[in-house]
Amino acid sequence: SSSEQQRWVLEAYRNASGKNLGDADFLTQLKGEDRARNPVDDADAFKAALRYPAINRYWFWRLDYILWELYQNSPASDLFSGLESGEKAAISAYRFKANRSIEHVHPQTSTEPWAEEDLHAFGNLAMISASFNSAQSNDGVGTKFGRVKDQRASRGALESIKMLLMFKAADRREANWSE
């Protein structure tokens, strides 16, 4: 659970506070502890754990952190090529929030249904705020991507780096978001 995640981070901080670790060393220590606590060795079990509704929200936070860190260290990475300046600014200004709501980019109820396996897979999911999720309702992918596009203009308003990259992966068009 999220509270368990918070507890170990606080405990790691307390343990490191007397060791005079620099920021980089402390971050390396945290990442090692995180990998030990959240192993991804069994690919089948990991894939099953990344399915809605059983997915732990931690994985969305972890991915957004990895994407954010990669952008901070390697903004020229192929992953970010093709991003518009507003999208890059949105990632730079990204603020981690206690978002708790999981959104299906392709809606669960749609005139163009998807296979359950694809609909509830991590690739079709993003974690966003409850208020942004309620605005999504059962809207189509194009409407949802339009809202992601609107977020780029508002500093610090990006809900999910993952969702922005999903938008980019679909070449910013609803028709390109498919199973």
What are these regions (language model features)?
Residues 1-179:
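Flexible coil/loop and intrinsically disordered segments
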